[in-house]
């Protein structure tokens, strides 16, 4: 050849650039030129080129070639091997001689194209292999391409493709040896190459020869394997090698390049193609490039990386019209594929520019494109590295996409397969097949991807198909998983695809290099392969078809794939030469998109612009116009070739092995077109094409392969048969057929080969077949070529179809995806049947007869399918249906393909003998159809069994025959037994006849598992007879021990599923593997597990809607050996039934149970740990189930775990949940109703220690009986668990009795304890109770009287938080008494609050205290306060309390008259208080207040003066004690404060107050009482005795601190001290007590002075020693106790009345008067000290300043304190100010009375003490009390100082008295009283209280003024606690009552 040099495949190829081999296209029959070229070119190139040329009769002399190579004659091409300037050192340019000039017949042409397998004379020197200058041409008739593993040796491949490593041989071995059919090849070419291995021969002749040497050497092999073509493709994979596209003498990159997919080789090829697009790329449709691609793809995929580079370089530029189209198509195809996985595929479009004229060449580029697609795939998960290359490739090859798309048939699959292939470029077709099978298993486009990846990773065994279909789904082991989902329609396609996959993979790599590779890749799929190999147009279509085919289901995923493919292919095309071609219908990913892609490709071939238009088309358009338009396009674009490829492509589409078919059809089309030069009109046979497409698509599913085979030629053939267009198609078909075979080889390795052989053998037949095949039928027929093969296919397809088709047909995707596709889908299933029918017809009629029919008729039939092509998609369905039953068709389609494959391989060797191949095909079909593509059926060219029986151990049965047994008879007998049982014909495949009779049983493509056969035989008379002929039957595999076995039970299987078939076993194995994998993902465990099915039995063999249950026994093996069944069971039971059912694919009844359960020690010696449970309702069937015991163990363990978890919820449990182990010892049926069953078991804890029966039963019995029954699933009799040894256990009754005993003992003890506590508490409060005895009557009366007030105060108490009404009252009063009250209050409060008894006593005490002190004090204070306060501030307060004031007034006068006994005074007070208030408490309080208020002092002044003198003495005595006391008190107060804060304060305070002053207080109190009696005589006759006793009792009650105080000085002192202490607290308390603040504010003191002015002056006179305040204070000190008592009483009353503003008013009134007076008059250091000590009491009492200062001490100014009640503060202050001048003086005088009052007040305080107890505000009250007392003391230092009460009495009493006086005498309340009462009290009543309700307010008030503060404090106490309107209301009522009483008393006093 010019510039062609034969190079050694090794160094020569790599080292130097090859000279380009140029085959000058001769006019039409320049066979000689071609030959010459070939001759010139050593066998390597020449044979390939010659084959190509032969394929192209026009180029080669048709004379010679046409007879020889029907295929080659189609085109005679010159292979020009030139250096590609830009791209590769050497490019092979194949020139077409006259296109189509020499189609002896379309069939012939078809055959030659096949033969032209690789006239690849071009080396990809491209980027990757520059050294591949070697002009190695791959020439092989497609027939020659043998699926056999004649795989070109690496060396040979290297020779052929020096640059590319001939990895293909491994993968392609069967395929790569595509023998160019002798007819197709030039004789020279043929000579070098055996007809079967013609390509090899060519290679041999030239460098390529080496590459093809194997092929050549093994012509038989070529013919033999349907995958042959696949292999051939593999060989083609070499970028250098020319893909043997049957149609053209297109130089495909060498198989090696493909195999390697080495970039350089492919690039070189691409370059070659690019340069000699016309020549090089011009693969006739017959050129097997797509098919080679299919095989090649498998190989190229591995070298995909390499391929990546060349794409740009390689241009398939046909000089012919196809050039641009080709490029465009390639691009588009590539793009189509690319869009999905590898957009890079589009890269090669530039390089792959091939003229439309050279469809074959274009086909080659398509192959590259296919490679690109694979590259894209690469970019997909599987070929990431390749993917980048793919990009390049994409750009390079326009059509690679299509091939890829073939792969893409399953959108994912297609890509994946490429990737996969790339990984396993070289895997043998068988491997590919396995992959495809895997893919089948995957059965989904998605799965395909996953599978692909795995395959890619693994080896390129059936990579493409598997990858495409299955790998995407299975990440881990695509192969393993592939079988998992055989049902998916994709599987059949996958299997086809798989083979193509391999090629595709190879191409994929190459695709990276060039689009040709891409094209090839799809062929590898079988479907995809075709598009790749197709010319650009064909490629484009091919892609579309491929996509359709690759889709899981041709039909279903046809739409899906179509879009994918289309997208890929289009994009490739668009990128490449023709933007139009680059239609990239990839964008149209819809099925329509896919179709448009094909159309686009076709159009691109025809017109790039048109292609571009097509691209826009939707997949639907593609689908419908795929046939119609693409053919048209081809025709128009590439006169015929371009369109023909489209048509072919469509046909492949139609077929599930769409790629291969598409490829071959495309190639054929090109061939037809080229050779026939069919014009677009012919191609444009849109209907036929479309129809074809639809049919193909139906075929595509499974049938696709079959159809592809047939359609390749047969489909095209019909078209050829029809008009020239038809003829073109036929020719293309023929080529396609060859291609189909190649494709089949790719998709179904064997099938492809078979078709090739068939075509070669029966070109005419093929042609005939094709037409009859119409679309799918034709294809099938063509594939069948030999009728018998077709028939075989038909049968097989049906079976396969069923399984596969079930998968495939179901796909709605196809239908939904595209109308056409939908139709196709329907058509597919129908088509398959049709194919079957046609096949049958074709088979019987034989190719020629069919040809006659087919061309006109079958084609019409096909036309029926095809004719409606546009509709046809549907029509094909109809046609299919018509031709064959839809079901049959569906079943057949896939199987057919498989069968075709098988046959193809077998037929390929005997080109002439089509029938034998068909049978092979049938098995292949079954294989393809079955997901079992994995079976090496492909490799075997034998019937494609659905399972791989190369390692038949799982299926072999070994029997020992009796001596007398005759083997022939035994075989017959066994067959008969099995036939009867299985209800179908079976065959025995005997492996060994001697010694042991070893055989396996098959039925058609199905293989029966050994165990299913053994189960039949052992129950037959052959074994069971008395004199059995068979002594023993056993499987050939090793059965593990029972402890390793696990049993799973399926509920049922559908009647269509035969559990005896190997595919069912494989599916279950895969499901179990998947389940184990899923479990192991979440549970650490052994990996690399394998499942071995040991037995499968089904209970009911009769055919029913559901056959079951199915028992499956299996073992799991790891690297260390078999796993224990219990371990496997435990592992699998982590899955739910639903999950496990999902993995197995059938509903599961029992997940996994071991045959042997581990048992613990069941010895009788451990019977003590046995527990017994009786279940009810256990049926015998359940009981007999061997799993019953295990289930009960698990449920009991669950029960225990639940108990332990619940226990942990109650308390930390000792038993860990879920770790208990239950071992059932015995399960026995008991007699009785309701089917009782006794379980005897024992429990071990997590540590393996056995629990005793008692402990176990106790633990279990903690569970609720109902819950236990739910868990166990059965009702339980009696107790849940009972120890076996002692069935008698304490009955629930006895247990309950025990409980009662416990309750009877514990509860009484508790009750006693409670009583003791209460008694102790009461005893603690006995002090208060002591007060009660003082005046029982008073108490009772007061209680009665106070009931209302109590109620009111109770209400307030509740709000305040006080426990008792009394407490509340006390609180109120105590609040007024800052210090003493505090002390008393605290105790009393504590007492009262703590216990009701204390409350009552406190009430009584309060009343009594109030009565005596309050009477006396109130009398005095009221009088004084009435005068002072009355004068000062009588108005409002008195008005407000006028009612009470009058009442209290009389008592005051009477008290003024002096009652001899404090009791009388108190009684009087009580009486007074009763009338106004229902409760005495309030009245007494009022009286006390009234007495406290200065009004009383005026009355008392005369006697008080004396008393004052006495009190001064006492005060002097007491002061000393008081000082000490005050210190002590201060300390105690602190303690109390702490206690109080803790809630104990009030009580102790009371105790201190009462106890401290007991004796002295009694003494002083008596004096004061006497004074009070005098004062109170008029109003009340309360015996002072009572008061004193009360006082004493109170004092006794009150803590000894009080006595200590007395010891220190007067009780008042003590209290003052306390108050002082409290004062510190007082600060706090003051705030609570606004009253105190009032006092402090000096309002109360001023008020007192106002009222007491006279008395205070008198008192001052009496106590001149004391400064006005001081002397007052001092004199009162003796009477301070009394005053204190009085104060307490008053405070109590005040607290009771606290709410009433009368007290505040009095306080205010007094305060105001006093403060000024006190400051000026008396601020004795003593007083101040006291004041400081006492806090609010003394300081206020000592001086007005002191009160204020005391507040200041507290840090609060009196007014500030009151600020919370500004009205009060100011009011008090104002009143004070009003009073001040007088008050000071009066105060001095008043102090004496106050001193008396102080005495009273002391009693009052005592009374008050209890009340404070009542108050929850205790602390506040105490503070208030202190503050108030202090202020009062400050106001009236005289008496008040000595005793808190008395001190306070001056001012405080007035204030308190004011409350009473104000109430009793609105005016008489001391001016200050009234005044303060009016502002302070009113405010409290109205808003003051509420506002001051906050404790804060109270304290402030306390600060304001002693008097004011006091009332306020009491009020406040209520308020803070309650601060609610109701509380205020109650307090107001009380105050009203008190004020009324006070006013009365005051009036009386006055």
Curated annotation (Swiss-Prot):
It is a multi-pass membrane protein. Residues 378-398, 1454-1463, 1911-1923 have a biased composition (Polar residues). Residues 1-10 have a biased composition (Basic residues). It comes from the Eukaryota. The record marks 1643-1644, 1749-1750 as: Breakpoint for translocation to form KIAA1549-BRAF fusion protein. InterPro entries: KIAA1549. GO terms for cellular component: photoreceptor connecting cilium; plasma membrane. Residues 1-37, 378-402, 875-919, 1373-1463, 1702-1740, 1837-1923 are annotated as: Disordered. Keywords: Cell projection, Chromosomal rearrangement, Membrane, Phosphoprotein, Retinitis pigmentosa, Transmembrane, Transmembrane helix. Residues 879-894, 904-915 have a biased composition (Low complexity). The modification Phosphoserine is found at residues 1388, 1395, 1554-1555, 1624. The keyword Transmembrane helix applies. Its main location: membrane. It is found in: Membrane; Cell projection, Cilium. The modification Phosphothreonine is found at residue 1622. O-glycosylated. O-mannosylated by POMT1 and POMT2 and elongated by POMGNT1. The chain crosses the membrane at residues 998-1018, 1299-1319. Pfam families: KIAA1549. May play a role in photoreceptor function. It is linked to Retinitis pigmentosa 86: A form of retinitis pigmentosa, a retinal dystrophy belonging to the group of pigmentary retinopathies. Retinitis pigmentosa is characterized by retinal pigment deposits visible on fundus examination and primary loss of rod photoreceptor cells followed by secondary loss of cone photoreceptors. Patients typically have night vision blindness and loss of midperipheral visual field. As their condition progresses, they lose their far peripheral visual field and eventually central vision as well. RP86 is an autosomal recessive form. A chromosomal aberration involving KIAA1549 is found in pilocytic astrocytoma. A tandem duplication of 2 Mb at 7q34 leads to the expression of a KIAA1549-BRAF fusion protein with a constitutive kinase activity and inducing cell transformation. Belongs to the UPF0606 family. This is UPF0606 protein KIAA1549.
């Amino acid at each position: 050849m010019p510039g062609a040099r034969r190079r050694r495949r090794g160094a020569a190829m790599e080292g130097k650039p090859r000279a380009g081999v140029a085959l000058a296209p001769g006019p039409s029959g320049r066979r000689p030129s071609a030959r010459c070229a070939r001759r010139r070119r050593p066998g390597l190139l020449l044979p390939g080129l010659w084959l190509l040329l032969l394929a192209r009769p026009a180029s080669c002399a048709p004379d010679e070639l046409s007879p020889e190579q029907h295929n080659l004659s189609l085109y005679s091409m010159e292979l020009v091997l030139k250096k590609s300037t830009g791209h590769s050192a050497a490019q092979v340019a194949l020139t077409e001689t006259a296109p189509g000039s020499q189609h002896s017949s379309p069939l012939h042409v078809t055959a030659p194209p096949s033969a032209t397998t690789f006239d690849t004379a071009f080396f990809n020197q491209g980027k990757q292999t520059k050294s591949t200058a070697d002009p190695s041409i791959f020439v092989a008739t497609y027939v020659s391409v043998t699926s056999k593993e004649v795989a070109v040796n690496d060396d040979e491949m290297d020779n052929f493709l020096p640059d590319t490593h001939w990895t293909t041989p491994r993968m392609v071995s069967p395929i790569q040896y595509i023998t160019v059919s002798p007819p197709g090849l030039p004789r020279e070419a043929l000579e070098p190459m055996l007809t079967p291995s013609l390509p090899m021969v060519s290679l041999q002749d030239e460098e390529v020869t080496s590459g093809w040497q194997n092929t050549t050497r093994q012509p038989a092999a070529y013919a033999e394997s349907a995958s042959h073509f696949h292999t051939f493709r593999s060989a083609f994979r070499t970028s250098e090698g020319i893909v043997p596209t049957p149609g053209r003498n297109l130089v495909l990159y060498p198989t090696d390049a493909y195999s390697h997919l080495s970039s350089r080789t492919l690039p070189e090829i691409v370059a070659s193609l690019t340069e000699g697009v016309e020549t090089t790329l011009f693969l006739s449709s017959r050129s097997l490039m797509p098919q080679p691609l299919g095989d090649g793809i498998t190989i190229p995929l591995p070298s995909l990386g390499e391929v990546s580079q060349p794409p740009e370089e390689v241009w398939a530029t046909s000089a012919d019209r196809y050039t641009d189209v080709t490029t465009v198509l390639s691009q588009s195809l590539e793009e189509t594929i690319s869009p999905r996985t590898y957009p890079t595929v589009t890269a090669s479009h530039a390089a792959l520019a091939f003229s439309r004229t050279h469809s074959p060449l274009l086909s080659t580029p398509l192959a590259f494109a296919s490679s690109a697609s694979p590259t894209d795939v690469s970019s997909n998960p599987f070929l990431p590295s390749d993917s980048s290359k793919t990009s390049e490739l994409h750009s390079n090859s326009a059509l690679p996409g299509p091939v890829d798309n073939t792969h893409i048939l399953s959108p994912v699959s297609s890509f994946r397969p490429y990737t996969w292939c790339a990984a396993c470029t070289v895997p043998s077709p068988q491997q590919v097949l396995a992959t495809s099978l895997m893919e089948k298993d995957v059965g989904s486009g998605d799965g395909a991807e996953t599978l692909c990846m795995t395959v890619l990773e693994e080896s390129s065994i059936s990579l493409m198909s598997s990858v495409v279909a299955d790998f995407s789904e299975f990440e881990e082991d695509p192969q393993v998983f592939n079988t998992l989902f055989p049902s998916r329609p994709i599987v059949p396609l996958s299997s086809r695809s798989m083979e193509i996959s391999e090629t595709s993979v190879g191409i994929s790599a190459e695709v990276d290099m060039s689009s040709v590779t891409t094209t090839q890749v799809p062929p590898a799929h079988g479907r995809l392969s075709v598009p790749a190999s197709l010319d650009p147009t064909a490629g484009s279509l091919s892609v579309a078809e491929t996509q359709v085919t690759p889709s899981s289901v041709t039909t279903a995923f046809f739409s899906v794939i179509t879009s994918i493919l289309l997208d890929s292919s289009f994009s490739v095309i668009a990128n490449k030469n023709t933007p139009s071609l680059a239609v990239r219908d990839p964008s149209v990913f819809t099925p329509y998109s896919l179709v448009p892609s094909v159309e686009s490709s076709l159009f691109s071939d025809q017109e790039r612009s048109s292609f571009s238009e097509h691209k826009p088309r939707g997949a639907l358009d593609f689908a419908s116009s795929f046939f119609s338009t693409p053919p048209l396009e081809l025709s128009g674009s590439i006169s015929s070739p371009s369109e023909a490829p489209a048509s072919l492509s469509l046909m492949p589409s139609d077929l599930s092995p769409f790629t291969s078919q598409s490829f071959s059809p495309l190639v054929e089309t090109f061939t037809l077109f080229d050779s026939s030069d069919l014009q677009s009109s012919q191609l444009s046979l849109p209907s036929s094409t479309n129809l074809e497409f639809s049919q193909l698509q139906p075929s595509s599913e499974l049938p696709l392969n079959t159809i592809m085979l047939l359609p390749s030629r047969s489909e095209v053939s019909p078209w050829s048969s029809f008009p020239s267009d038809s003829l073109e198609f036929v020719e293309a078909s023929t080529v396609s057929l060859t291609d189909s075979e190649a494709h089949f080889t790719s998709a179904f390795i064997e099938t492809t080969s078979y078709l090739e052989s068939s075509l070669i053998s029966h070109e005419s037949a093929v042609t005939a077949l094709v037409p009859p095949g119409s679309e799918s039928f034709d294809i099938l027929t063509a594939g069948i070529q030999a009728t018998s093969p077709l028939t075989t296919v038909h049968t097989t397809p049906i079976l396969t179809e069923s399984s596969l088709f079930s998968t495939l047909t179901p796909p709605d995707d196809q239908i939904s995806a595209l109308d056409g596709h939908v139709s196709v889908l329907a058509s597919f299933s129908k088509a398959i049947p049709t194919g079957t029918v046609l096949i049958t017809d074709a088979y019987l009629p034989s190719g020629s007869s069919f040809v006659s029919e087919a061309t006109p008729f079958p084609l019409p039939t096909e036309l029926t399918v095809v004719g409606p092509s546009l509709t046809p998609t549907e029509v094909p369905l109809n046609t299919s249906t018509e031709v064959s039953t839809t079901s049959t068709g569906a079943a057949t389609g896939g199987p057919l393909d498989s069968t075709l494959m098988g046959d193809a391989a077998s037929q390929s060797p005997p080109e002439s003998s089509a029938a034998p191949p068909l049978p092979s095909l049938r098995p292949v079909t079954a294989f393809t159809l079955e997901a079992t593509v994995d079976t090496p059926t492909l490799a075997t060219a034998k019937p494609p069994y659905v399972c791989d029986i190369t390692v038949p151990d799982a299926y072999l049965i070994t029997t020992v025959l009796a001596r007398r047994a005759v083997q022939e008879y035994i075989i017959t007998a066994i067959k008969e037994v099995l036939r009867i049982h299985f209800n179908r014909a079976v065959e025995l495949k005997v492996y060994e006849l001697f010694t042991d009779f070893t055989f396996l049983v098959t039925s058609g493509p199905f293989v029966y598992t050994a165990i299913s056969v053994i189960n039949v035989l052992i129950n037959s008379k052959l074994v069971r007879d008395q004199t059995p002929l068979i002594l023993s039957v056993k499987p050939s595999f090793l059965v593990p021990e029972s402890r390793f076995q696990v049993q799973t039970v399926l509920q049922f299987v559908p009647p269509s599923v035969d559990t005896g078939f190997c595919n069912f076993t494989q599916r279950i194995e895969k499901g179990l593997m998947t389940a184990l994998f899923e479990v192991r993902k979440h549970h650490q465990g052994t990996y690399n597990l394998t499942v071995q099915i040991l037995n499968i039995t089904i209970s009911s063999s009769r055919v029913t809607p559901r056959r079951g249950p199915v028992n499956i026994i299996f073992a799991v093996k790891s690297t260390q050996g078999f796993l224990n069944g219990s371990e496997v069971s435990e592992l699998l039971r982590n899955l739910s039934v639903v999950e496990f059912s999902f993995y197995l694919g059938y509903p599961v009844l029992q997940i996994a149970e071991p045959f042997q359960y581990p048992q613990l020690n069941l010895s009788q010696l451990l019977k003590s740990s046995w527990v017994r449970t009786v279940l009810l309702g256990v049926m015998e069937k359940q009981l007999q189930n061997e799993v019953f015991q295990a289930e009960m163990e698990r449920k009991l363990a669950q029960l225990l775990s639940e108990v332990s978890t619940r226990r942990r919820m109650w308390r930390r449990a000792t038993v860990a949940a879920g770790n208990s182990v239950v071992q059932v010892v015995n399960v026995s049926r008991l007699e009785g109703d309701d089917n009782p069953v006794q379980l005897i078991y024992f429990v071990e804890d997590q540590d393996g220690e056995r629990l005793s029966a008692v402990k176990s039963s106790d633990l279990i019995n903690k569970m609720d009986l109902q819950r236990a029954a739910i868990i166990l699933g059965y009702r339980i009799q009696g107790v849940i668990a009972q120890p076996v040894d002692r069935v008698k256990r304490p009955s629930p009754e006895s247990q309950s009795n025990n409980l009662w005993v416990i309750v009877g003992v514990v509860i009484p003890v508790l009750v006693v304890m409670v009583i003791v506590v209460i008694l102790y508490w009461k005893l603690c409060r006995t002090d208060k109770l002591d007060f009660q005895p003082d005046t029982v009557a008073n108490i009772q009366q007061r209680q009665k009287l106070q009931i209302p007030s109590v109620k009111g105060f109770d209400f307030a108490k509740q709000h305040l938080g006080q426990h008792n009404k009394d407490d509340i009252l006390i609180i109120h009063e105590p609040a007024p008494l800052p210090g003493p009250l505090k002390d008393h209050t605290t105790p009393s409060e504590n007492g009262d609050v703590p216990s009701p008894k204390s409350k009552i006593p406190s009430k009584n005490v309060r009343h009594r205290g109030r009565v005596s002190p309050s009477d006396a004090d109130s009398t005095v204070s009221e009088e004084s306060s009435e005068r002072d306060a009355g004068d000062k501030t009588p108005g409002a307060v008195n008005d407000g309390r006028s009612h009470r004031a009058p009442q209290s007034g009389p008592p005051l006068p009477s008290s003024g008259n002096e009652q001899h006994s404090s009791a009388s005074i108190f009684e009087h007070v009580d009486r007074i208080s009763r009338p106004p208030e229902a409760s005495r408490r309030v009245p007494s309080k009022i009286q006390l207040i009234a007495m406290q208020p200065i009004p009383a002092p005026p009355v008392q002044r005369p006697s008080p003066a004396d008393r004052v003198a006495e009190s001064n003495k006492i005060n002097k005595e007491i002061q000393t004690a008081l000082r000490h006391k005050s210190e002590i008190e201060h300390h105690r107060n602190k303690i109390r404060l702490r206690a109080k804060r803790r809630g104990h304060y009030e009580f102790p305070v009371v105790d201190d107050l009462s106890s401290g002053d007991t004796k002295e207080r009694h003494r002083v109190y008596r004096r004061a009482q006497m004074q009070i009696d005098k004062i109170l005589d008029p109003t009340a006759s309360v015996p002072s005795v009572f008061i004193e006793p009360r006082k004493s009792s109170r004092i006794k009650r009150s803590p000894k601190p009080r006595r200590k105080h007395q010891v220190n000085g007067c009780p008042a002192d003590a209290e003052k001290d306390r108050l002082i202490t409290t004062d510190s607290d007082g600060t706090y308390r003051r705030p609570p007590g606004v009253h105190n603040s009032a006092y402090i504010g000096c309002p109360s003191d001023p008020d007192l002075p106002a009222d007491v002015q006279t008395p205070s002056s008198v008192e001052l006179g009496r106590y001149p020693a004391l400064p006005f305040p001081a002397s007052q204070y001092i004199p009162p000190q003796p009477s301070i106790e009394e005053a204190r008592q009085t104060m307490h009483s008053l405070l109590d009353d005040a607290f009771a009345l606290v709410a009433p503003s009368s007290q505040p008013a009095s306080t205010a009134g007094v305060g105001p008067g006093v403060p000024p007076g006190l400051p000026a008059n008396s601020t004795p250091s003593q007083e101040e000290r006291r004041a400081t000590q006492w806090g609010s009491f003394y300081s206020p009492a000592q001086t007005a300043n002191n009160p204020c200062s005391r507040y200041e001490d507290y840090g609060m100014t009196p007014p500030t304190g009151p600020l919370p009640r500004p009205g009060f503060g100011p009011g008090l202050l104002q009143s004070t100010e009003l009073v001040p001048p007088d008050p000071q003086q009066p105060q001095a005088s008043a102090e004496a009375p106050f001193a008396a009052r102080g005495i009273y007040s002391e009693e009052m305080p005592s009374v008050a003490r209890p009340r404070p107890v009542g108050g929850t505000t205790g602390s506040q009250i105490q503070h208030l009390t202190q503050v108030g007392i202090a202020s009062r003391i400050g106001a009236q230092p005289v008496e008040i100082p000595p005793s808190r009460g008395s001190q306070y009495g001056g001012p405080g009493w007035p204030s308190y008295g004011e409350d009473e006086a104000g109430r009793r005498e609105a005016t008489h309340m001391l001016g200050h009283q009234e005044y303060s009462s009016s502002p302070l009290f009113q405010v409290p009543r109205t808003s003051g209280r509420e506002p001051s309700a906050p404790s804060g307010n109270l304290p402030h008030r306390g600060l304001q003024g002693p008097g004011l503060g006091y009332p306020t404090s009491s009020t406040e106490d209520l308020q803070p606690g309650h601060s609610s309107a109701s509380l205020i209301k109650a307090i107001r009522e009380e105050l009203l009552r008190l004020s009324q009483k006070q006013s009365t008393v005051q009036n009386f006093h006055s």
